[in-house]
């Protein structure tokens, strides 16, 4: 059951029935007896360092007076809130002891100004609410989810549950929109790893780093070292604030310049407003730009302009702002490691292990490198590198640009007479993440055995069959209740993991993500807020001038006044911003129910979210707990279906989400559709109702992926507009990925009237695929990792002669081809033209964000090498279908005709034919021309395959894997690459036609020569006969004539 606040299964809090004289009602509403408060030896703080969130989605709850850190020496429990609000007596459900009906979730508010383009996710969550009395807002800190009783009581042979802690034993998945889901596969990012929205955030490793505020480098990238203005002050409601402004300009179409403003607003909350607003979205101003006051009145109307003063020109100011913004960024981490022998389980037993056993040493060797501390110059994590007072050696490693120093219990100094081993606990007890290594036979670990307020995450690792070639490990995780979940997700049962580099990467990523996630806990959130407030107060007090915001307006913002300003881009120009534009929506998974039916279950729950769409990504952020609940790249958007206040968005493999909008009907939906047309390659779907004919047939065929492979002529399907290459997204109201192929086939066979949502093919008739699908197809091509295979002997029943196969082999692999574009860059499939030639892209001006070419080559990824032909088995080329001479293609198993179709490289076809003919001296002229005819048939097969279906074409790669020279020209984008392929195919057809014409001319010339030869031979014989007769008549000897 999903853990959304206000959803089904979420108890209503903060409401209490009004007082009444009804004894039955009073008895029914009598609260449970409060638990007894035991004595504790710990001092009771005024505000506990670790306060839990108040709902499944991080809803704020009044702080409990008791410390939630329940350890072995303190058994106190969190008390109930002292006061609750009232509920009306007329609520009948309350009288029966049933939960009250939850109100419909409200649409989250969107920050003004409307067209401010946010740089990252945390900027979307920036709040102008006045600062709280304590150190930071509770809702901002409580990004973790409240653990249920089942999570706290979950136990295994590795880990025991405890109050105040969440246990992860494996199989939990990633919590997203609609509940837990399987972890995403590359190139998709986990929700917790999404940070920057304005720029592409590529997944470079199998395990992503999560909960990192990568947008903290915004000031360093766009302000530091560049001309800008800083303003500091003390706002009455917000406290100390720091504002940075910079005006940017870039070339526009027609030679003009386009201006925008980059803005950073910092308050005492840890979230910072970062982003850009176009000058077209602002009121008209002078050529040198708006004044800082006018700009802030529009961007930050909640900020009091009178409190701001211009920052000083001291070099300390930008350095302090860098430190302030990047305090959350750290690439040096320390992790503790405790050693638990067989039969052990308590803290004292683990700290008092003097020497490491063989299994522990095997684990340490896998995890990192043992380094000598004395003289060690890298990150030392508070260890002594001069006098060896903290041990002589330690464990050190690097992972994804992070330095990690491990505090290993057996490598730290051992004190014989100290049972608590304070010299060891002084380091490990201050580590946020602790790895507990268990030998086989260890007792289950319980987090309450560790007495520390800093250790928030425990990674329990147990070895199985250690010190053998078959060593494996299992992993369990225990985290404090206010620490949000983090990845990588554990497999079911926590393993097993083989002792290899993949397990090392998994464990290191888990440790880094755990420490980053623990930063959202109350204790560390309060510490970071105090530090931030001190920096802001210092800037507002000591680093300001007497120049007010009004006085600074006459200086203007930096601009090159000599350039001509571009003409306004008209309505909708603000939609072309590279950053993320925001709308308030209610989102739900896209499993559509029948009209009039009531949605139920996890997929029927609507979650209030902020919808952010940038030039690179689309995200849904739950503002209540500050989590990204859904994300996808804009290149993965397939299509959308919209009405006045609802939009169904299809992405990836055809999955769908439903978004509902507030406000004027059609306004927000129109803005979102216009934005999607600019930043994605998707299009609008079509809804078709397809009746059956008299024989009960629908008149079309689809494959397992939902692509229409054949539409019969003069059927209802053809009349409705269904065409080959279209893609079914919904069948009878259900998304295709949510249906098994058998279930989808049953619906198509049995439904009286089939209603389908169709994604039409592109303008060339090719089916549309998302980038993730293309990436997955590239990973599924085993031939890309090996040597190229020989050409198959048959293509559609045509037997190739040896000279023909030699020609194809030379065209494919000959390294002596003349110079030209790179080998791999020339091989392109026409079906990928659908990813680049959509009509909505034509409306995008030059200033619109363009997807950078930072991803693997899609065309190479979908081009497979030929496979080795099997001598004893052959795959049928096509499957028979009614009314068609050729069958539909199986997408899961590409037809051999595609695997045997090859595109020649830069080697000229005419030169190849001439060279082969010169070498094939034993063959007759007719055999040589027959070989050329077979080549023409093969090339026609290629063209027919491309025009009939958009399947990936087998890649004819270089067997030697020779890298492409940088000096060789290469098409710049997909459209150029596809155009290059089309021109190459046209040239191939022209060469074939010319060769046929040359053959016909040559045959005609041969026939003429033979005719002339026979005529000359006859004339010669006739002349010889006449000469013989003449010589006889003259008396000449015949021997001379003979």
Curated annotation (Swiss-Prot):
Protein name in the entry: Signal-induced proliferation-associated protein 1
Induction (free text)? Repressed by 12-O-tetradecanoylphorbol-13-acetate (TPA) in promyelocytic HL-60 cells.
Q: Name one GO molecular function term.
A: GTPase activator activity
Region spans: Disordered: 1-87, 132-153, 830-903, 946-980
Regions annotated as coiled coil: 972-1034
Here the segments flagged for biased composition (Low complexity) are 832-845
Q: What domain of life is recorded for the organism?
A: Eukaryota
Q: Specify residue ranges for compositional bias: Basic and acidic residues.
A: 957-967
Description of how the protein assembles with itself and partners: Interacts with RRP1B; the interaction leads to inhibition of SIPA1 GTPase activity.
What the entry lists under SMART domains is as follows: PDZ (SM00228)
**Phosphothreonine-modified residues are where?**
64
* Subcellular compartments: Nucleus; Cytoplasm, Perinuclear region; Endomembrane system
Keywords recorded for this protein, A-Z: Coiled coil, Cytoplasm, GTPase activation, Membrane, Nucleus, Phosphoprotein
Species per Swiss-Prot/TrEMBL record? Homo sapiens (Human)
């Amino acid at each position: 059951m999903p853990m959304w606040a206000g959803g089904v299964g979420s108890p209503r809090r903060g409401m209490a029935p009004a007082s009444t004289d009804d004894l039955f009602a009073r008895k029914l509403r009598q609260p449970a007896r409060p638990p007894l408060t035991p004595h504790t030896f710990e001092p009771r703080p005024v505000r506990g360092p670790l306060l839990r969130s108040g709902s499944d989605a991080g809803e704020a709850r009044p702080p409990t007076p008791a410390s939630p850190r329940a350890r072995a020496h303190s058994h106190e429990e969190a008390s109930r809130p002292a006061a609750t609000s009232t509920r009306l007596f007329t609520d009948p459900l309350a009288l029966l002891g049933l939960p009250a009906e939850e109100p419909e979730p409200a649409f989250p508010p969107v920050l003004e100004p409307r067209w401010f383009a946010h740089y990252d996710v945390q900027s979307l969550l920036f709040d102008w609410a006045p600062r709280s009395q304590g150190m930071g807002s509770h809702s901002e800190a409580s990004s973790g989810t409240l653990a249920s009783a089942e999570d706290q009581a979950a136990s295994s042979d590795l880990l025991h549950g405890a109050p105040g802690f969440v246990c992860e034993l494996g199989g939990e998945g990633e919590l997203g929109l609609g509940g837990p889901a399987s972890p995403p596969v590359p190139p998709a990012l986990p929700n917790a790893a999404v940070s920057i929205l304005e720029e592409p955030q590529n997944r470079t490793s199998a395990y992503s780093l999560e909960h990192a505020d990568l947008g903290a480098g915004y000031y360093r990238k766009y302000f530091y070292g560049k001309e800008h203005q800083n303003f500091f002050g003390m706002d009455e409601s917000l406290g100390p604030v720091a504002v940075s402004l910079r005006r940017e300009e870039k070339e526009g179409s027609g030679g003009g310049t386009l201006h925008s403003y980059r803005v950073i607003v910092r308050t005492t909350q840890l979230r910072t407003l970062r982003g850009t607003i176009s000058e077209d979205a602002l009121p008209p101003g002078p050529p040198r730009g708006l004044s800082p006051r006018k700009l802030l009145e529009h961007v930050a109307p909640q900020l009091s302009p009178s409190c701001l003063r211009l920052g000083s020109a001291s070099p300390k100011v930008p350095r302090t702002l860098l430190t302030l913004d990047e305090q959350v960024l750290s690439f040096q981490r320390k992790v503790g490691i405790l050693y638990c022998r067989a039969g052990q389980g308590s803290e004292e037993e683990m700290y008092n292990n003097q020497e490491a056993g063989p299994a522990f040493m095997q684990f340490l060797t896998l995890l990192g490198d043992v380094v000598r501390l004395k003289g060690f110059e890298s990150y030392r994590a508070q260890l002594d590198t001069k006098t060896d007072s903290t041990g002589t050696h330690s464990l050190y490693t690097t992972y994804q640009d992070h330095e990690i120093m491990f505090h290993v219990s057996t490598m730290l100094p051992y004190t014989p007479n100290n049972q608590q081993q304070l010299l060891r606990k002084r380091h490990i007890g201050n580590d946020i993440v602790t790895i507990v290594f268990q030998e086989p036979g260890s007792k289950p670990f319980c987090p309450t055995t560790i007495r520390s307020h800093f250790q928030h995450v425990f990674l329990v690792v147990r070895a199985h069959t250690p010190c053998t070639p078959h060593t494996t490990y299992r992993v369990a995780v225990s985290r404090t209740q206010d620490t949000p979940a983090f990845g990588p997700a554990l497999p079911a049962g926590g393993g097993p993991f083989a002792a290899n580099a993949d397990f090392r990467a998994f464990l290191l990523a888990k440790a880094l993500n755990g420490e980053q996630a623990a930063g959202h806990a109350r204790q560390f959130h309060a510490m970071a807020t105090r530090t931030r407030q001190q920096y802001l107060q210092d800037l507002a007090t000591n680093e300001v001038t007497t120049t007010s915001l009004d006085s600074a307006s006459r200086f203007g913002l930096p601009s090159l006044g000599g350039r001509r300003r571009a003409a306004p881009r008209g309505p909708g120009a603000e939609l072309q911003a590279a950053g993320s534009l925001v709308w308030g929506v209610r989102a739900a998974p896209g499993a559509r129910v029948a009209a009039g039916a009531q949605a139920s279950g996890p997929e029927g729950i609507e979650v209030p979210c902020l919808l952010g769409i940038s030039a690179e990504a689309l995200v849904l952020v739950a503002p209540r707990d500050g989590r990204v609940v859904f994300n996808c790249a804009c290149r993965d958007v397939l299509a959308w279906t919209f009405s006045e206040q609802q939009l169904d968005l299809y992405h990836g493999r055809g999955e769908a989400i439903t978004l509902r909008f507030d406000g004027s009907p059609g306004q927000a939906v129109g803005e979102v559709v216009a934005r999607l047309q600019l930043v994605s390659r998707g299009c609008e779907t079509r809804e078709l109702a397809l009746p059956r004919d008299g024989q009960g047939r629908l008149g079309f065929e689809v494959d397992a992926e939902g692509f229409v492979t054949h539409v019969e002529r003069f059927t209802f399907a053809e009349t409705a507009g269904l065409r080959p290459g279209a893609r079914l997204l919904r069948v009878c109201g259900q998304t295709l990925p949510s249906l098994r192929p058998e279930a989808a086939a049953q619906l198509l066979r049995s439904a009286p009237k089939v209603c389908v949502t169709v994604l039409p093919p592109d303008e060339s008739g090719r089916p549309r695929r998302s980038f993730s699908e293309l990436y997955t197809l590239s990973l599924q091509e085993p031939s890309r990792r090996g040597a190229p295979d020989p050409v198959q002997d048959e293509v559609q029943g045509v037997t190739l002669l040896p000279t023909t196969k030699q020609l194809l082999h030379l065209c494919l692999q000959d390294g002596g081809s003349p110079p030209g574009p790179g080998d791999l860059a020339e091989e392109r499939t026409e079906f990928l033209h659908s990813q680049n030639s959509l009509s909505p892209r034509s409306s995008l001006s030059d200033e619109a964000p363009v997807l950078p070419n930072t991803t693997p080559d899609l065309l190479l990824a979908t081009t497979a090498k030929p496979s080795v032909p099997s001598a004893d088995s052959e795959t049928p080329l096509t499957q028979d279908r009614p009314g068609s001479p050729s069958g539909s293609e199986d997408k899961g198993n590409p037809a051999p005709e595609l695997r045997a179709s090859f595109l020649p490289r830069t080697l000229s076809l005419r030169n190849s034919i001439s060279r082969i003919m010169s070498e094939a001296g034993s063959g007759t002229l007719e055999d040589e021309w027959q070989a050329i005819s077979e080549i023409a048939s093969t090339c026609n097969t290629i063209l027919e395959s491309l025009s009939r279906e958009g399947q990936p074409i087998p890649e004819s790669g270089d067997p030697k894997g020779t890298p492409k020279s940088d000096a060789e020209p290469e098409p710049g984008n997909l459209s150029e690459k596809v155009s290059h392929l089309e021109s190459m195919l046209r040239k191939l057809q022209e060469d074939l036609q010319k060769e046929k014409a040359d053959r016909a001319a040559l045959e005609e010339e041969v026939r003429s020569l033979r005719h002339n030869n026979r005529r000359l031979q006859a004339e010669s014989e006739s002349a010889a006969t006449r000469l013989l007769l003449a010589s006889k008549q003259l008396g000449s000897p015949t021997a001379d004539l003979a």
